[in-house]
């Protein structure tokens, strides 16, 4: 199984009044489209801390530029590239080239808890985006309430699922820990496994002869480069989606705080989606009842 390389971009949004900068990444859209989305939401309905910041000072005082093109297989790799730039900006790292003047800049903090409007406001907003009484699909509904960075957490995790299971690879562990524990796989694995054991979270170690191995391209790539002596004793940690999610919710890393933020937000989204569907259904019933009454009035007039 071969995973094709994709192209993503790391960008910086700067302003003309201080040294603050916001680092972001994009996969399918151009950086100009990303900027237009931020500016539009800042003017109308900010969904994240940065858009609120942009709203205070006015989108016209901000500009965007690309700082790196990234070729990646998994979105986690793009997340790590984005995090590297945010980390080095805050720490005053040294780089040369187009992005060199970003270092020692203050990155705008963009990780507050998600704040939802009132239920009635959410329902009204969703109804405004409903066309011909066709209910919004859940993903579209969530995109009205959550910023792209929050939604991207769910997309990134889903990308690693294979038939409801996750291989806890070095890349996954690096994504979880980020710059807190860079390039220290044994440390990452130890603390991950400690959480799994302490909380008795179901997991499984599989060998190279297990049928499940064939479903994970990363494991197959490792097998191709392992000598026979190592291959016979090598084991890979695999978990089902629910167990992996539980482990993420318990780990004390910045990335896992984002994961908790995402899942808690999705629980609230699910509740609000139910309110929206209820209102939409009742509105349709009320409309049908009114039409029936109008037809009766017409018949007897």
Curated annotation (Swiss-Prot):
Transmembrane stretches, start-end: none
Top-rank taxon, per record: Viruses
Pfam families, per the entry: MSV199
Protein name per the record: Putative MSV199 domain-containing protein 093L
Gene3D superfamilies xref list: GIY-YIG endonuclease
Recorded family membership: Belongs to the IIV-6 019R family.
Organism, as annotated: Invertebrate iridescent virus 3
């Amino acid at each position: 199984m071969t995973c094709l390389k994709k192209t993503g971009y790391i960008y910086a949004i700067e302003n003309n009044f201080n040294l603050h900068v916001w680092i972001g990444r994009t996969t399918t859209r151009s950086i100009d489209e990303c900027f237009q989305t931020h500016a539009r939401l800042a003017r109308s309905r900010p969904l994240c801390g940065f858009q609120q910041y942009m709203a205070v000072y006015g989108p016209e005082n901000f500009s965007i530029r690309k700082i790196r093109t990234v070729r990646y297989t998994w979105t986690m790799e793009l997340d790590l590239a984005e995090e590297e730039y945010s980390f080095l900006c805050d720490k005053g790292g040294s780089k040369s080239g187009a992005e060199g003047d970003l270092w020692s800049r203050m990155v705008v903090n963009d990780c507050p808890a998600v704040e939802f409007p009132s239920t009635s406001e959410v329902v009204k907003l969703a109804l405004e985006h409903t066309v011909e009484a066709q209910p919004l699909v859940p993903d579209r509904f969530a995109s009205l309430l959550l910023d792209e960075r929050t939604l991207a957490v769910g997309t990134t995790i889903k990308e690693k699922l294979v038939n409801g299971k996750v291989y806890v690879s070095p890349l996954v562990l690096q994504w979880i820990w980020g710059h807190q524990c860079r390039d220290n796989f044994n440390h990452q694995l130890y603390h991950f496994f400690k959480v799994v054991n302490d909380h008795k979270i179901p997991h499984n170690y599989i060998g190279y002869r297990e049928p499940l191995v064939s479903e994970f391209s990363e494991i197959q790539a490792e097998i191709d480069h392992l000598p026979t002596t190592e291959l016979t004793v090598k084991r890979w940690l695999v978990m089902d989606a629910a167990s992996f999610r539980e482990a993420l919710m318990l780990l004390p890393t910045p990335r896992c705080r984002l994961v908790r933020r995402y899942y808690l937000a999705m629980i609230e989204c699910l509740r609000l989606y139910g309110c929206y569907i209820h209102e939409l259904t009742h509105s349709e019933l009320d409309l049908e009842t009114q039409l029936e009454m109008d037809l009766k009035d017409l018949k007897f007039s």
